[in-house]
UniProtKB/Swiss-Prot annotation:
EC numbers, comma separated: 1.1.1.205
Keyword Repressor attributed: no
Organism: Acinetobacter calcoaceticus
Record's protein name: Inosine-5'-monophosphate dehydrogenase
Pathway named in the protein's UniProt entry: Purine metabolism; XMP biosynthesis via de novo pathway; XMP from IMP: step 1/1
Length: 488
């Protein structure tokens, strides 16, 4: 018997109604919850795709106030290294800096600094700071077998600060002594941390950046349900990851639910997101397993073919509403996929999402992985679904997401995505600016001062295809493309 559960709607089927407003777009707050314990300064998350998010994109996302989720289509060590790159890129204070002893040779020091991409190393003896050695000390040194004690800045010239010193005083000290690094010490001259002028400059350049309690940029990472997942999670947690995303095509499955439960039981300090799902029942199952947020979206992405190949899914607006209605604000939900315009972000939030995950919007940007290609007079970058043959073949991370065996050979894989190219878009910051500007406009139209106002108070109208045609540009030839509007 044919059972029709409900009529389902997506972004082009609805419009938000304007409301009385005293709110100006420039005055709204875009701060929102990613999970139970993590807040973002903008409601934007970059997708865990191998043509969208690696460390460079994750750094840029966090600097702009969002967060990037590192894809898992790489081995464990490589993914953990990507996490470390993000966490080490900026730090209010490096809590556990790499150190050397006075007896360490210059050759050994150079090897350490090269391997860890650092330029200044504290010199410690019996847990006490005795000096610091920087790139200036080693740059023209020819005797590589001598100890660093011969070339370091010793205690008599060493500039240090006590733990808890104000940012203003530290900046004044750096400027007064014309130095780029200062050591933080305790009452007995024991090393507490390292502060660099570079981190101050980064913080000033990106005042809206999303950081943890130690002043480091936040980053997430995707894992699956395969046999190597426990080792992968352990390595990611050790590297300092802020959030683990148990990322599969079908989040309402026993393996995903048990993996979410396992991560929360073994690493309770780490936030866990489960997905992808499209129903309220799935959301409640993941909530019961301990998920700190859920990810909603089966098949809405521009490169996803799940709805056609498997005949499975739910139009995204209805999926978001179904999950939000079931969760009743106990944990946040992330709307994942099908977002070509900033107005769709506003619709997703109005339907119940707290954050938006995007892939195609950020694919083709300078920060996205991959080389720029020249084709028929235009520049492009590759973009593919994680369910495409290219992503799954020979890479266990992506095949695992779709519950398939990459070792079976490409001819045995059943793809649920395609491979393609998108125009090169330049720096991602320009796109984020336009998308968040559109969201601000929507909040102004609806009288929403904060994201939660839009989530709770939005009202929709259902429209026809004629209504959507009327909404788009019509009866005119575009002569100059707008930065936030592209059709086709």
């Amino acid at each position: 018997m044919l059972t029709i559960v409900q009529e389902a709607l997506t972004f082009d089927d609805v419009l938000l109604l304007p409301a009385y407003s005293t709110v100006l777009p420039k005055d709204v707050s875009l701060k929102t919850r990613l999970t139970r314990g993590i807040y973002l300064n903008i409601p934007l998350v970059s997708a865990a795709m191998d043509t969208v998010t690696e460390s460079r994109m994750a750094i840029a996302m966090a600097q702009n106030g969002g967060i990037g989720i590192l894809h898992k289509n790489m081995d464990i060590a490589a993914q953990a290294a990507e996490v470390r790159r993000v966490k080490k890129f900026e730090a209010g204070m490096v809590k556990d800096p790499i150190t050397v002893s006075p007896e360490t040779t210059v050759r050994e020091l150079i090897a350490i600094t090269s391997a860890n991409n650092i330029s200044g190393v504290p010199v410690v003896k019996d847990s006490k700071v005795v000096g610091i050695v920087t790139g200036r000390d080693t740059r023209f040194e020819t005797n590589l077998e001598q100890p660093v004690s011969n070339i370091m800045t010793g205690q008599d010239r060493l500039v240090t600060v006590r733990e808890g010193e104000s940012k203003e005083n530290i900046q004044a000290l750096l400027q007064k002594h014309r130095i780029e690094k200062v050591l933080v010490v305790g009452e007995s001259n024991e090393l507490k941390g390292l502060i660099t002028v570079t981190d101050f400059r980064k913080a000033e350049s990106y005042p809206n950046s999303c950081k943890d309690d130690l002043g480091r940029l936040r980053v997430g990472a995707a894992v699956g349900t395969g046999a190597d997942t426990p080792s992968r999670v352990e390595a990611l947690v050790e590297a300092g990851v802020d959030v683990i995303v148990v990322d599969t095509a079908h989040g309402h499955s026993a393996g995903v639910i048990e993996r979410v439960r396992w991560v929360k039981q073994n690493f309770p300090q780490v936030q866990v997101i489960g997905g992808n799902i499209a129903t309220g029942d799935a959301a409640l199952a993941l909530l019961d397993a301990g998920a700190d947020a859920v990810k909603v979206g089966i098949g809405p992405g521009s490169i996803c073919t799940t709805r056609i190949v498997a005949g499975i899914g739910m139009p995204q607006i209805s999926a978001i509403d179904s999950v939000a209605s079931a969760l009743k604000d106990q944990i946040p939900l992330i709307a994942d996929g099908g977002i070509p315009f900033s107005g769709d972000m506003a619709k997703a939030i109005g339907a119940g999402a707290s954050t938006i995950m995007v892939g195609s919007l950020l694919a083709g940007t300078e920060e996205a992985p991959g080389e720029v290609e020249f084709f028929q007079g235009r520049y492009y970058k590759a973009y593919r679904g994680m369910g495409s043959l290219g992503a799954m073949a020979g890479r266990t991370g992506s095949a695992d997401r779709y519950f398939q065996d990459s070792k079976a050979g490409a001819e045995k894989l059943v793809p649920e995505g395609i491979e393609g190219r998108v125009p090169y878009k330049g720096p991602m910051g320009n796109i984020v600016h336009q998308m968040m500007g559109g969201l601000r406009s929507s909040m102004g139209y609806t009288g929403s001062a904060v994201i939660e106002d839009l989530r709770q108070n939005a009202k929709f109208v259902k429209i026809t295809s004629a209504g959507m045609s009327e909404s788009h540009v019509h009866d005119v030839t575009i002569t100059k493309e707008a930065p936030n509007y592209r059709v086709g």
